Amino acid sequence: MAIHLYKTSTPSTRKGAVDSQVKSNPRTNLIYGQHRCGKGRNARGIITARHRGGGHKRLYRKIDFRRNEKDISGRIVTIEYDPNRNAYICLIHYGDGEKRYILHPRGAIIGDTIVSGTEVPISMGNALPLTDMPLGTAIHNIEITLGKGGQLARAAGAVAKLIAKEGKSATLRLPSGEVRLISKNCSATVGQVGNVGVNQKSLGRAGSKCWLGKRPVVRGVVMNPVDHPHGGGEGRAPIGRKKPTTPWGYPALGRRSRKRNKYSDIFILRRRK
């Protein structure tokens, strides 16, 4: 990814660092409009997810997470920007005339060939079941349920590692550090998701954040006591508590929010960091 640094001509561009290489020119038969209803509200119009609203209109790109074009090779034609995710996508032309979008693997360039199936080479961008992969393979776009499509390791720069295979299950180390079991029949894509330098981008100004549909975040310490536990006091006052809390009084830092006795606990060998 090529990072473009703005010249400090105005205050809004002084800290800007954006990607200026990948453009978007999607195929009309692979996109559709998506009504972004609610924007953080529930059916009654009450805010349930704070700091959401506004944003530019988007067209959703149909991404092939299943990779069910078995044993048919495809060629990468374009690498495009997708406003719905921080990873890039690439358009694939398959030998049977099918055209689909997939997540862009790191290092893939226009003209490369990919294929999915059971007995395909272990090379970047190819999709195959975990049972056919050697230990230590770096993978992304991993299925949890057979045939449902990839659900794990899909963000920009994400990569998981196949560390063991025993019985009907395979053991994976996910990007979060979690170690969990997945069925060996589930498929995954070889390699790492592209756009690994996404954390080097800097929007530079508040307006760019608003284009993404993210509203300003107000500190609780500057609110009134009726609005936040940190609020109130004379002048610039501390939060008045031993530990920071959420607007609803729960511990804000380090509190585990995962549901106890969740059905998937039996598949998790080590929790995320």
Swiss-Prot record:
Segments for region (Disordered): 1-20, 224-254
Single GO cellular component term: mitochondrial large ribosomal subunit
Chief location category: plastid
Cross-referenced SUPFAM superfamilies: Nucleic acid-binding proteins, Translation proteins SH3-like domain
Entry's Gene Ontology BP terms: mitochondrial translation
Keywords, alphabetical: Chloroplast, Plastid, Ribonucleoprotein, Ribosomal protein
GO molecular function list: rRNA binding; structural constituent of ribosome; transferase activity
Compartments where located: Plastid, Chloroplast
Tagged with keyword Nucleotide-binding: no
Subunit details: Part of the 50S ribosomal subunit.
Homology family: Belongs to the universal ribosomal protein uL2 family.
Protein name: Large ribosomal subunit protein uL2cz/uL2cy
Species the sequence originates in: Nuphar advena (Common spatterdock)
Gene: rpl2-A
